[in-house]
Amino acid sequence: MVFRIASSPYTHNQRQTSRIMLLVLLAAVPGIAAQLWFFGWGTLVQILLASVSALLAEALVLKLRKQSVAATLKDNSALLTGLLLAVSIPPLAPWWMVVLGTVFAVIIAKQLYGGLGQNPFNPAMIGYVVLLISFPVQMTSWLPPHEIAVNIPGFIDAIQVIFSGHTASGGDMNTLRLGIDGISQATPLDTFKTSVRAGHSVEQIMQYPIYSGILAGAGWQWVNLAWLAGGVWLLWQKAIRWHIPLSFLVTLALCATLGWLFSPETLAAPQIHLLSGATMLGAFFILTDPVTASTTNRGRLIFGALAGLLVWLIRSFGGYPDGVAFAVLLANITVPLIDYYTRPRVYGHRKG
């Protein structure tokens, strides 16, 4: 009998960083397609701008640090950062905003800490928050979904608005944001928060065109379901684990249900929280970032639950309509503490 002698490693895992990132990029296709369908070609233009900006910014920093540019860019992490930021901002936001946010995310939030694996905060969400705080008007100027929109920009119009601020016929963002009722439309979460503060009843708010969807906001419910489909595929491919998405969604649903039962006239119903804004994108594509999330199974459950609670608190009582980005970054801060207290006990070790 011949025994084969081999050196370590004795187990082989094909889940290299580049492959996992590629799986996440592929899983984003349904969500991207849904956003293209409901919000137009601007989403694709923003993705292209963000992708090019991310690759150039990363290449520049790597060149300055005298590191291999080609080898690092092949891990696809820069592309994923650009993609996540691009789908998080309004589709017709000015071109310089997505470039600025992407460059900030890659250089400051990622490479300044040492590159992939060293950054404590999700780079895409850092870029998003910087843009949201600096340019709140542009970052909240979402188009109405095509089913309730009056003016639907084509591909050429989308490019012209992004780069010049006007369509070929002279239309601007105020014109494009008009809904079928002649009123500028906002996202379902923004509409709900603004209307409640204006003294409108929930019954009145639910009559707005933006809530004409079957389950939640028009268009947004299908966008979230598309991101959910991509997330389920990631779970099936074992590219992510179930702990964070499940604990995040369960906690958000539980908090939203309890809040709605106690104060139905001022707080949004659970289906609006689950199927509006960046809920499913955050649950499966942002919170599950292996670098900035907890690394233990118990820690992942705590991390996801904390993020779900923070999203509900910010949406319900904060100054911003959608709290996913802030919740992710606040939860990122707690990761070292969570990991410290959820470390698996070493076999045979007793607490001293």
Curated annotation (Swiss-Prot):
Native organism taxonomy: Bacteria, Pseudomonadati, Pseudomonadota, Gammaproteobacteria, Enterobacterales
Protein name as it appears in the record: Ion-translocating oxidoreductase complex subunit D
Assembly mode: The complex is composed of six subunits: RsxA, RsxB, RsxC, RsxD, RsxE and RsxG.
Membrane topology: Multi-pass membrane protein
Similarity annotation: Belongs to the NqrB/RnfD family.
Enzyme class: translocase
Broad class of where this protein is predominantly found: membrane
Function statement: Part of a membrane-bound complex that couples electron transfer with translocation of ions across the membrane. Required to maintain the reduced state of SoxR.
Alphabetic keyword roster: Cell inner membrane, Cell membrane, Electron transport, Flavoprotein, FMN, Membrane, Phosphoprotein, Translocase, Transmembrane, Transmembrane helix, Transport
Presence of the UniProt keyword Zinc in the record: no
